[in-house]
Amino acid sequence: MKLHIVPARTGLAWVKSGIFVFRRQPLAMAALFFMTMAAMSMASMVPLVGPALALTLLPSATLAMMVASAEALQGRFPTPAVLLVAFRTGRQRLHHMLQLGALYAAGFLGIIALSSLLDGGLFAQVYLGGAPLTQETAENPDFQAAMWVAMALYLPLSLLFWHAPGLVHWHGVPPVKSLFFSIVACVRNIGAFTVYGLGWMAVFAIGGVLVSLLSGLLAVVGILPPGNVPGTMGGIMVGLAMVMATMFFSSIVFTFRDCFDPPEKPGTPEADNALPPPTEPGTD
């Protein structure tokens, strides 16, 4: 397994690839993303351990979307079976993915605990769904400080786990080592990941502007009564957010594909879900 250093413009290619693969199988990819989110939501409802259980499933859910994207790009229809890909490749892989999930849950909950030192747990209660976000809460300086600290700490956690599911699944890297290789790959390719992040920010911003323009246009021409604009706009925004989130998760496999060599052992369970071919040098 060799780490690849890619040019910054590759980040834009990753964004385009995520959108492209979604366009190839829009219904399948959207349905799979919805099912992963629904499974995590159901897990979060388990008394006492629900939030931690849902966080534990996130690396497996990310891997499922990576495999689904790879299959869609290769002309195969991604079925709901990919949702269980983390649990179908042998006992050792299963244990490693569960360990990875436990590490992620511990890291995330640790960040929330640290933020609670600043505001007495107010941000934690809002973020984990235990309290409503009111204007008074949002304007609370302690709440804002806790929010910014949590966001700052989540960035390195995200980099640690960005490539980890793929490394465990396709290369058989142990969980702790996968975290090290993941953050090294992200840091060494910081230019590409910066362009990648900015690209997705632009996509989300453009989507929001288009929804606003569409809602205003419908109201002006009389198709949509003015009183229904907020509700309709909110519904469209939710649907658009789901679509763009699906595109984003569909693009993750391309960041992994270009940063590491493909699996070295064809025919193994992890190699059966083959990665798409790498981005050609000079393409964007």
Locate the predicted segments by residue:
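Hydrophobic alpha-helical membrane segments
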Residues: 1-284
